[in-house]
């Protein structure tokens, strides 16, 4: 992976990242394709309608079904999905933690029950990389020990100890596999844990900074803490993060979260929010969000965002979308998802432009002004 820090405006950064499959600028939002597809959309939508340069797929879900061996047989995720740009795959640790009621965390890894058939499985630092080697993802995430917040200081310390232990095991294993010709062209990111504990976050960040990861992620946030505490945690981490590696805030978030964390030096984001909210009838616009099911939209001839250039806004009215949603027409999911993802990707583009023009502070003021804040 090639990484170039192009420009800074305060802590906000524009960086250029090149993988084996695409080059993209940050800040970047990565649409989430949990099971190898962004819900209701296909590779053509992602490339030609949205021009997404990188998307995320989920190791936990695709390990269980269809299995990594099936994906490998199709030539990895790129051959399987026909999306020929970059893929980032998470380690599956979050899903093992959140979807399995009886998951158990040991120093060896995470034991969990499949949410599909109840079968038992063990994720280890090595096994999750083996799975991602089969996926041939461009960016692989290591296994980390996630804790729900609030958590005791003792549990947070255990989480950081395990995450550092697993990071050492993962980076050593990855280098040994590359020496065998496996994982060539695949990049590996470490994950910083520590809850909202300043000293534990610092300890984890400093430890992972010493390891030759291609990038660093901030995990374990947006899991129950207040937004202000998340922003404070990210800002406090900034001095301890290598400036010459990408910074990825996992699973975040709202448009406001993106703006606030870009201001604090974050480069990469992913979240299911734009597509999940789309399926529930909620649209994101520059003026805030609204739900299309309201009666006021029945005879509304305007587009969702009058100035929006997405496929949905170029072609269809709020009145039509109100009808599709109430009729439970499946077409609605695609049209709504296209709009919301376009909004998120356009927000990232606008932030890049503002940073390059040294006007991010003014951009942020305008962002909140349009929302009446």
Curated annotation (Swiss-Prot):
Top-level taxon in the UniProt lineage: Bacteria
RNA binding as annotated region, ranges: 251-257, 275-279
Record field: catalytic activity: 7-aminomethyl-7-carbaguanine + guanosine(34) in tRNA = 7-aminomethyl-7-carbaguanosine(34) in tRNA + guanine
Binding site for Zn(2+): 308, 310, 313, 339
Pathway note: tRNA modification; tRNA-queuosine biosynthesis
EC number annotated for this UniProt entry: 2.4.2.29
Active site: 90 (proton acceptor), 270 (nucleophile)
Enzyme class, broadest EC rank: transferase
Function per UniProt: Catalyzes the base-exchange of a guanine (G) residue with the queuine precursor 7-aminomethyl-7-deazaguanine (PreQ1) at position 34 (anticodon wobble position) in tRNAs with GU(N) anticodons (tRNA-Asp, -Asn, -His and -Tyr). Catalysis occurs through a double-displacement mechanism. The nucleophile active site attacks the C1' of nucleotide 34 to detach the guanine base from the RNA, forming a covalent enzyme-RNA intermediate. The proton acceptor active site deprotonates the incoming PreQ1, allowing a nucleophilic attack on the C1' of the ribose to form the product.
Family in the record: Belongs to the queuine tRNA-ribosyltransferase family.
PANTHER family found in the cross-reference section: QUEUINE TRNA-RIBOSYLTRANSFERASE
Protein's UniProt name: Queuine tRNA-ribosyltransferase
Source organism per UniProt: Campylobacter jejuni subsp. doylei (strain ATCC BAA-1458 / RM4099 / 269.97)
């Amino acid at each position: 992976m090639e990484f170039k820090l192009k420009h800074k405006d305060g802590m906000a950064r524009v960086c250029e990242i090149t993988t084996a499959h695409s080059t993209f600028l940050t800040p970047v939002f990565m649409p989430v394709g949990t099971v190898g597809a962004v819900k209701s959309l296909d590779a053509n939508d992602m490339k030609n309608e949205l021009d997404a340069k990188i998307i995320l797929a989920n190791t936990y879900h695709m390990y269980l079904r269809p299995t990594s061996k099936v994906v490998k047989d199709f030539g990895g995720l790129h051959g399987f999905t026909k999306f020929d740009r970059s893929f980032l795959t998470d380690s599956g640790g979050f899903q093992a933690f959140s979807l399995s009621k009886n998951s158990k965390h040991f120093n060896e890894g995470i034991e969990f029950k499949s949410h599909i058939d109840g079968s038992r499985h063990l994720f280890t630092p090595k096994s999750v990389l083996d799975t991602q080697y089969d996926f041939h993802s461009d960016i692989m995430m290591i296994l980390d020990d996630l804790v729900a917040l609030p958590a005791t200081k003792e549990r947070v310390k255990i989480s950081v100890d395990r995450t550092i232990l697993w990071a050492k095991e993962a980076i050593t294993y990855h280098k040994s596999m590359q020496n065998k010709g496996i994982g060539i062209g695949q990049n590996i990111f470490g994950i910083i844990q520590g809850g909202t504990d300043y000293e534990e976050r610092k300890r984890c960040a400093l430890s992972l900074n010493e390891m030759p990861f291609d990038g660093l992620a901030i995990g374990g946030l947006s899991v129950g803490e207040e937004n202000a505490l998340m922003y404070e945690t990210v800002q406090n981490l900034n001095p301890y993060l290598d400036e010459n590696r990408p910074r990825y805030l996992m699973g975040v978030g709202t448009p406001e979260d993106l703006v606030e964390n870009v201001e604090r030096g974050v480069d990469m984001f992913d979240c299911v929010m734009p597509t999940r909210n789309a399926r529930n009838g909620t649209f994101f616009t520059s003026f805030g969000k609204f739900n299309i099911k309201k009666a006021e939209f029945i005879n509304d001839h305007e587009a969702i965002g009058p100035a929006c250039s997405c496929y949905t806004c170029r072609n269809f009215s709020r009145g039509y979308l109100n009808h599709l949603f109430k009729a439970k027409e499946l077409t609605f999911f695609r049209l709504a998802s296209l709009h919301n993802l376009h909004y998120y990707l356009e927000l990232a583009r606008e932030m890049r432009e503002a940073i390059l023009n040294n006007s991010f502070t003014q951009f942020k003021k305008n962002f909140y002004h349009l929302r009446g804040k």
